[in-house]
């Protein structure tokens, strides 16, 4: 069900549905073994599960996506000189894109001053920050080390910067990209 539910409903709604179904099954099992007077409560199981799913929508608000994808990261070169500056540097990023897929939860977030980063399951895989050099070098170094490169294969699209770096080399006429998550392809547009 996760392969269907996660892309269609999202993580929060899949969680709500799964817990609701578990509660329903548990109550039905308990009701089967309950005294006859308590068996009258069995018809309330379905409305109770529906109520839980509706209430869960208010529990899993927009910040849910930011919290479940918050990864450990550090902002190199941004030492704060005051507490106010520390708070400004470490403020919450703006969530630009969020999608739960069958294989990953993908987000694109933005810190102030146009610092974008793409995360897969909370881990930053691409950004416009200091790791841009790494993304570029992953494309340039292999192309420069090969005597006559004509094509290349990139495993994992990320932001597409590595592919772009490869395509700047005149001998390379074809770059194939293998990406397991369609959500990463969508997010790369940012």
Describe each model-derived feature in a short phrase.
Residues 1-190:
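Alpha-helical transmembrane segments of multi-pass membrane proteins
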